[in-house]
Amino acid sequence: MTTSRRDFLKFVVAGSMSAGCPLPHSLRPVPDEPSAQIDGDHFAICHEVRDGTVFEKPPVSKRYDVIVIGGGVSGMAAAHFLRDHNFLLLEKEPHFGGNAYREEYQDQGYATGSAFDEKDTESYQLAKELGMTLLPIDCWDPSIIRGEFVEDTWHSGLDHLPYPISVRSAFKKFRTTLLEMDPEKDAAHLDSFPISDILKSYPPELTQWWDAYGPSNWGAKTQDTAALCVVEDLHFNGGEEPDVRVTLPGGNGALAGALAKSLAAMHGERMLGDATIVSVDPQKTEVNVTYFHEREAHTVAAKAVIMATPKFITARLVAGLPDEQSSAMRAFRYCPYPVVNMIFDKPVYNKAYDTWCPGNAFTDFIVADWVLQKNDKAYKQKNNILTFYAPLSERERPLLLQDESCQTIAENILRDFRKLQPAFRDAEPIEVHFYRRGHPMYLPVPGNFTKRIPTASRPMDRIFFANTDSIGPVSDISAAVVSGRRGAEWSIRRMGNSSASAERLASAVGIRV
């Protein structure tokens, strides 16, 4: 974590920009292989891993039943379901949680990424198992458009959009049209074209709204979003069912923290952070994994390995991938994603949980303690913490490499927030916490769900591919837990039946192959 003091306020920058970081400066590639340029900038080293540099691999020093690579919710869920087995969980960051990571300001939790769950999902059930009570949000999302607060955007708010009657009618028609579509029966068709093909027949105000909503929720604007995603989402957010979303301060980082705490209490010696994986090598009866920790290389082996890592890095670590599968993994696209928490010493905004603001330097913002305000009568807010989501386009990823450009992003967010409504004009945070991730969410481009994911996620003989980009159609907390559980079940079956095909075992645990 790096900390920078800024003239205009306290400005804290944190987060990881590369799935391969950090590598220690002492590493050297195998002779006669391309040299890694090690000049103090760990991003350059990470890119050597990304580009396929081969590092020296020491002999196997220890063996396990299962090695889980990736300490996000997917990897930790796999470890949780493997708790009766001899597992090792490896994570490149010093902390566990991945995109669901909770931070605090004076004991007040706030999210740095993944924000909420839904009732009765596998992740919700896991939270209950861990003794957590996720609280209902019970607040359909409003929007602030042209200075107007529009409550419950896709229900009653459609009559109050600050647009001409013709545009309001178009919003209603769009909602009605998509609610008539069946995202289950027509999944293959709806996944074959972008939602922009439908939106081009509507006024541009609809595209502007979805071009804010899409990047925040699944990393892509309308031209890169399969229609399936919007149809599914509108059935959830624009249908007649009540709001079933649940959360806690810190978002899904609360679940990640509870998982990490539970695992550490039972199996802390099997959890290793700051461990940078450089190779995953299948052998005849096991899989070798080489990683660096505290400047030293280690190779360990297991009967099965679960790759709970994004596909773009998985493809660069696992040896022997079939060409078709490697190509599918490398075809995944990921958005760069800063999340900015602004901490105020007086109330600024507490009208809704998640408010959409199309056309600004941020897409939406969340009231960090919303569910405590609404569900705990004794609760009193100490600081008003607002979490601003500001996903970038892929070409803007380099902006996150420098603190100065991160500061500019934060300043632009504050500028646009102040312009939203007169009440915000003098809003002055006492601190700004900037969390950056280079590749947190895969883009749900057409064909991703029905074609690319099944190909990319096909298990190898002793390697299972977990992570949310093994489920789809978008990245969410429930998919992380589902993929982790499936990975654990698959690994247990593999250990119990070494002769069964990987695909047969995959079908047994519900994998599309």
What feature does the model see in each segment?
Residues T2-Y64:
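Extreme N-terminal leader/targeting segments of oxidoreductases
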Residues V60, G273-L386, L420:
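Mid-domain catalytic core of redox enzymes
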Residues V66-L88:
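N-terminal Rossmann-like FAD-binding beta1-loop-alpha1 element of flavoenzymes
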Residues R83-E103:
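Glycine-rich FAD pyrophosphate-binding loop
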Residues Y124, K128-T225:
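Mobile amphipathic helical/loop "lid" adjacent to a hydrophobic cofactor/ligand pocket
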Residues D182-S279, E286-N288:
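Active-site/ligand-binding neighborhood in enzyme catalytic cores
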